[in-house]
A protein has these predicted regions:
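Short basic helix-loop element that most often maps to the first helix and adjoining turn
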Residues: 29-44, 73, 102-109
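Intrinsically disordered, low-complexity and often Lys/Arg-enriched segments
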Residues: 1-15, 117
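A short, Lys/Arg-rich alpha-helix, primarily the initiator
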Residues: 9-37
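Short alpha-helical DNA-recognition segment
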Residues: 39-55
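DNA major-groove recognition helix of helix-turn-helix/homeodomain DNA-binding modules
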Residues: 67-85
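Short, charged recognition helix plus adjacent turn
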Residues: 3, 84-119
Length: 119
């Protein structure tokens, strides 16, 4: 018998909502604007992020397939404040979200069948 891989790779075309697409485009263009305003070349910013120039171009075009950490790092380097907050505010926000998550169940389950008890 032949060997069957336990990993099946499925390629699916992912679609994003208009809101997500516009948000990515806005963030990408904002990164480009910040880079130009700070007089940072594409090559310099790419090196600081640790990516190729082509990956930086994808970031600036709002490509949804670029790792979010790279996009956030590019934004931080060019001075874009994400979440409209500074480091201390973000730390406080993280703490509050952690507190709220701690109050919720660890897992979410689909509701089961309801019992018909109307006789």
């Amino acid at each position: 018998m032949g060997h069957v891989s336990s990993k099946l790779v499925m390629t699916m075309k992912r679609t994003y909502s208009r809101y997500a697409q516009q948000g990515l485009a806005l963030l990408g263009k904002s990164i480009r604007l910040g880079r130009l305003q700070h007089r940072i070349t594409a090559q310099e910013l790419a090196e600081r992020i640790g990516v190729s120039r082509s990956t930086l171009q994808r970031i600036e075009k709002g490509d949804a397939k670029v790792e979010i950490g790279l996009v956030f790092e590019a934004a931080a380097i060019v001075g874009i404040k994400l979440f409209d907050a500074d480091d201390r505010t973000i730390t406080g926000m993280l703490s509050r979200v952690d507190d709220r998550i701690a109050l919720l169940p660890k897992h979410v389950y689909k509701a089961g069948k309801q019992v018909e008890d109307d006789f």
